[in-house]
Swiss-Prot record:
Gene Ontology biological-process entries: DNA repair
Site (Interaction with target DNA): Y73
Entry keyword ATP-binding: no
Cofactor(s) the protein needs: Mg(2+)
Enzyme class: hydrolase
Role summary: DNA repair enzyme involved in the repair of deaminated bases. Selectively cleaves double-stranded DNA at the second phosphodiester bond 3' to a deoxyinosine leaving behind the intact lesion on the nicked DNA.
Cell compartment(s), UniProt: Cytoplasm
InterPro entries (UniProt xref): Endonuclease-V (IPR007581)
Membrane-spanning intervals of the chain: none
Keywords assigned: Cytoplasm, DNA damage, DNA repair, Endonuclease, Hydrolase, Magnesium, Metal-binding, Nuclease
Molecular function terms, GO-annotated: deoxyribonuclease V activity; magnesium ion binding; RNA endonuclease activity, producing 5'-phosphomonoesters; single-stranded RNA binding
Name of this chain's protein: Endonuclease V
Pfam families: Endonuclease_5
Length: 223
């Protein structure tokens, strides 16, 4: 694995990421959520993609793609591992969203190219990174109150907002993916909350990917 070449690709791609608002349809009619996981000991990459109406946030379509994993797990290079399955799920959608929430990092990445930025750039679609763990940068400790907020900083640059979406839950790291500003990324996530730790797009993507009870109930009601 030529990591030097991949690192150079990341730096080059990151320079093309658009960090300002460029939504073609604002407000959006459809928002997607995307989640990637692995099966069979990492041999299979699974990507789930859901479509929700906005502002009702009702699930109207979902697709799950499974493909052979083409790259080993290497921290800092996960987008190269996850992107092919995301693309496969994206291509199955009968209609394309105006905005995509990706479970993962956007520009809050050492080389400013997490999976949300990589996917958004390749598809030229507005994306937001909604990550559960910090990958780089520093932030001031948050209070325990829901709504507590702090900028994630690295080398004098704000990479994300660190936001406690729910009491007694770890915060989310919300960042520009592509064609969405940092502040707008936070605002869109806040508009898509319904009382859970995760915003509805990535919560539903996780539910579909893992066949959680909420998705099983949804299937039963939509047969």
């Amino acid at each position: 694995m030529d990591l030097a070449s991949l690192r150079a690709q990341q730096i080059e791609l990151a320079s093309s990421v658009i960090r300002e608002d460029r939504l073609d349809n604002d407000p959006p009619d459809l928002i997607a959520g995307a989640d990637v996981g692995f099966e069979q000991g990492g041999e299979v990459t699974r990507a789930a993609m859901v479509l929700l109406t906005y502002p009702a946030l009702e699930l109207v379509e979902y697709k799950v793609a499974r493909i052979a994993t083409t790259m080993p797990y290497i921290p800092g290079f996960l987008s190269f591992r996850e992107y092919p399955a995301l693309l496969a799920a994206w291509e199955q959608l009968s209609q394309k969203p105006d905005l995509v929430f990706v479970d993962g990092h956007g520009i809050s990445h050492p080389r400013r190219l997490g999976v949300a930025s990589h996917f958004g750039l390749m598809m030229d679609v507005p994306t937001i990174g909604v990550a559960k763990k910090r990958l780089c940068g520093k932030f001031e400790p948050l209070s325990a109150e829901p709504g507590a907020l702090a900028p994630l900083m690295d080398k004098g640059e704000q990479l994300a907002w660190v936001w406690r979406s729910k009491a007694r839950c770890n915060p989310l790291f919300i960042a520009t993916g592509h064609r969405v500003s940092t502040d707008s990324a936070l605002a869109w996530v806040q508009r898509c909350m319904q009382g859970y730790r995760l915003p509805e797009p990535t919560r539903w993507a996780d539910a579909v990917a893992s066949e959680r009870p909420a998705f099983v109930r949804w299937q039963a009601n939509h047969r």
